[in-house]
Amino acid sequence: LSAAGAGMGNRLTCALLRRVDYRLWLAVRRRLRGSRPQRRFRHRHAVALANRQSLLGEGKLDFAWLMQRRQWLDMAAVSARNAALMSHLAHCSAQLDQVVEPLHRAGVPVLLAPMHTVSDVLATLVGAGVYPGRATVIVSGDVQAFARRSPEDEWRQRLDYCSIHDDPRHIAGTLSQTMLEAAEHRRNIILFPDITPDYTLHSNQDVAAKLACHLFGRPAHLHSGIVRLSRALRAQVVFYSLYFDR
């Protein structure tokens, strides 16, 4: 019954998001939800608060709202094709393309490196919208599973996936073909460099697997795989990050 109710709720949300500006929808939903975290996010909310206080000091963080907002944004883009959101994503792609296309024209392969901000799905769609119009995204299971459940549209024609959870031989074959096409300027590779802790915990424990640097005016620790891949391709890494323009 609960699963059926959730499915009906998602269909209703999707139908509304096809007709309502996503910013209005988010504003109304936030006013209605109250301040208490949803039960499924409660423990992660507590961990997120502790991490924020440890790293950045005191400050308010509504983790449950951030997670819910991300899910609605993903639905608005992939399933509902919300007109306002699609326009904003196209604008972001156009900005990114001002950097990417000249690099390709100059004979330099491109490795796109979005941050884990706002939504991984939206960041991937922005990267898929730049020259030459095709990309392979190296992902964990979440983005790939979400995209495969989405309706058939141009995003699924532009994007291919290489999951870090696949069989190693399959990963090697997929990456080899992807790198060949990237070197020939037929596609970009999208890799989230601030890769989530689950990958690091289940792979290389070596300190060398992390790279200390500065990004967007802040200290950062990135997974060094982005460096190795860019060196192998002799590619230019283009970092980008989505944010809410207030």
Where are the model-predicted features located?
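Hydrophobic, well-ordered secondary-structure segments
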Residues: 93-99, 107, 168-178, 238-240
